[in-house]
């Protein structure tokens, strides 16, 4: 029965990498610039965005993020939230994408349960993170 399914496990980085390799010149157009990826501008390609994801992953690694670490991504709802999760996945870290609507008390619960994770945030959620 399993031979009927062409299944590949979901891995955010591997899936993005494969898309970038197969279709590097396919355009990606944004309606606004992405704060966490300003170099992408309003228009990029899979290939170019893949390189920016790697740069961000290397920056996260330089901050100490490594395999198995949890990273709460708690920021405004933009496409860069997903790209940050892909960068974390490259390092074999575990991205935890959390809605920016949640109060700091909920984030405190995440921090406790995830055993002191990294938190990526932006100006929209900075005040709530300071309260954690």
What residues fall within each predicted segment?
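Conserved AMP-binding/adenylate-forming
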Residues: 40, 57-105
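Conserved ATP-dependent adenylate/AMP-binding module captured primarily in the ANL superfamily
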Residues: 85, 100-131
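Carrier-protein-dependent adenylate-forming modules in NRPS/ANL systems
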Residues: 30-32, 36, 91-93, 97, ...
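Nucleotide 5′-phosphate-binding alpha/beta core
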Residues: 14-15, 48, 75, 109-112
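Aromatic/hydrophobic pocket-lining residues that form the small-molecule binding cavity
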Residues: 49, 53, 81, 107
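A generic secondary-structure signal
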Residues: 18, 59-63, 109, 113, ...
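N-lobe entry segment of adenylate-forming
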Residues: 1-63, 67, 91
């Amino acid at each position: 029965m399993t031979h009927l399914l062409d299944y590949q496990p979901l891995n955010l980085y591997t899936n993005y990498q494969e898309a970038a390799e197969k279709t590097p010149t396919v355009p990606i157009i944004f309606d606004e610039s992405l704060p966490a990826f300003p170099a992408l501008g309003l228009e990029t390609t899979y290939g170019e965005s893949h390189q920016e994801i790697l740069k961000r992953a290397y920056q996260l690694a330089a901050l100490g993020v490594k395999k198995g670490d949890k990273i709460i991504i708690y920021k405004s709802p933009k496409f860069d939230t997903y790209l940050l999760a892909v960068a974390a996945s490259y390092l074999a870290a575990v991205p935890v994408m959390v809605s920016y609507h949640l109060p700091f008390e909920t984030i405190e619960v995440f921090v406790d349960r995830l055993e002191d994770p990294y938190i990526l945030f932006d100006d929209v959620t900075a005040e709530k993170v300071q309260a954690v």
